Amino acid sequence: MRVNVLGNGDWADLFKRGTEGKLLVCNMPPMQLTKEEVYASCMVDFKMMAALTEGSVNLGMYDWVLGNRPRRWMESHPAFYLKYSQNIKGFWTHVPPYAQLPGHAKSQAATNYSCGHMAVDYACRKMRATEVHLY
């Protein structure tokens, strides 16, 4: 199965709507996409959780795959969890060894692990993608 990972970087324009495969987006997609087009929005940081909580960002139209820090956010903000629980496709809390940089505290590994890295890891390990395209 092919999985496309769409980030917000300079090369996101290379992604064409209707491209074969399932689509994972990093946080907020760089273009308007429907729920039907997006398999899930992947989020890993407190910054996105805070933006969703305050209402400055709306991703309620998508399913979510959330990392370690969003999971911790939900544990400390139960009202937020209840409000958005229907959006949560799942939590992906695996942090690979390469995210643990030499000389950094072990707790820093999840911080070093970006949304794009998590989306690719999720595509390969959970979705069992045989082909992953990054945009």
Locate the predicted segments by residue.
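Acidic/Gly/His-enriched mid-domain segments of enzyme catalytic cores or analogous surface patches
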Residues: 10, 17-131
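Extreme N-terminal starter segment of soluble prokaryotic enzymes
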Residues: 1-3
